[in-house]
Amino acid sequence: MPGSRVIESTSRTSRKVKLSLMGPAFIAAIGYIDPGNFATNIQSGAAYGYTLLWVVVWANLMAMLIQLLSAKLGIATGKNLAEHIRDRFPRPAVWAYWVQAEIIAMATDLAEFIGAAIGFKLLLGVSLLEGAILTAIATFLILMLQQRGQKPLEMVIGGLLLFVAAAYIVELVFSQPELSALAKGMAMPSLPTSDAVLLAAGVLGATIMPHVIYLHSSLTQHEGSHTRAERYSATKVDVAIAMTIAGFVNLAMMATAAAAFHFSGNQDIADLDKAYLTLEPLLGKAAAVIFGLSLVAAGLSSTVVGTLAGQVVMQGFVRFHIPLWVRRSVTMLPSFIVILSGMDPTRVLVLSQVVLSFGIALALVPLLSFTGNRELMGTMVNGKWVQRIGQLIVVLVVSLNMYLLIDTMSGI
């Protein structure tokens, strides 16, 4: 029938459009599986088994909404979050925003860079400094893809995300978690002790990444040849798929740690080195190697994304541009200083997350304000319920990060 052929052709064209527009959310999703997430999820699973899996589920749902709002801002207005702040805030506030955003980007990169270096160290038996040099070389090579446009970089970052997801499918097979207990942990909220509250705050509070909010609105702001409706429709699919994969990885990390460590009497696993060394005798060499490879993949991809985010905030806030290789060189200096000074890398990783917490409200509040502004967003303005849920997320995430900040600073 001619009519059915037209409908089939239209449907096929729509799928091709969606496919061509997918990618930005995969770059953003990398921020949710960085080495900081590895450390928090492993510690939570080792200490409390499957009990805190529900926190990962809810944190991921919140992150989905936040990333969708960020992407929608770029689509609806053709400007990213940093540019909107620049255009609407007083100049002193804009400069203050830029400085804090750069500090946040560097603090985030510190955790990601050192995480990848630890991965190389564990896999190859090299020193942490040699691991850092390998990380620097690898990130420079990945960033060179940016010269060929956004798509090749999206494909590589997306490939690394899928690799980490595949690695954790294998880890789940090795660790064989108890499915009924796993499902119960995902569905039933429980906080058995005050330490569990702190770990839950760590899982949830470290979920929303300020630099990725800035970056996602930039990745979707360029119009191309597609309509806003087509782009937003594709973006919803993009965010749903990418963030679901990131959520699965976080769930798998915690479930693997629960199955491998908690129920074997290793509840005190608190750092990445110990997790790797404990995995080998429990689950075999292959499981430990896969863990190391996934840590390297997550660290490399997230540190590249952090570099791109830093470029976006600089261009957006102060209209200043430097070559990516210069930015990469500058932002990895703190990591080398930490390594050369002999500081505990896991401790530095935790402290970097505290610094990051300062920037969360500063990114979320204007994002919610702009996407709830009908004059700015037109027909793509947030609905009443989306706005209320967004406000609730802001209050919750900021409160948890302040709680984490106070607790961490009191322990120093």
UniProtKB/Swiss-Prot annotation:
GO molecular function per UniProt: cadmium ion transmembrane transporter activity; manganese ion transmembrane transporter activity; metal ion binding; symporter activity
Alphabetical GO biological process terms: iron ion transmembrane transport
Subcellular location: Cell inner membrane
GO CC field: plasma membrane
Membrane topology: Multi-pass membrane protein
Keywords: Cell inner membrane, Cell membrane, Ion transport, Membrane, Symport, Transmembrane, Transmembrane helix, Transport
Signal peptide stretch: none
A Pfam family: Nramp
Protein family membership: Belongs to the NRAMP family.
Described purpose of this protein according to its UniProt entry: H(+)-stimulated, divalent metal cation uptake system.
Protein name in the entry: Divalent metal cation transporter MntH
Name of the encoding gene: mntH
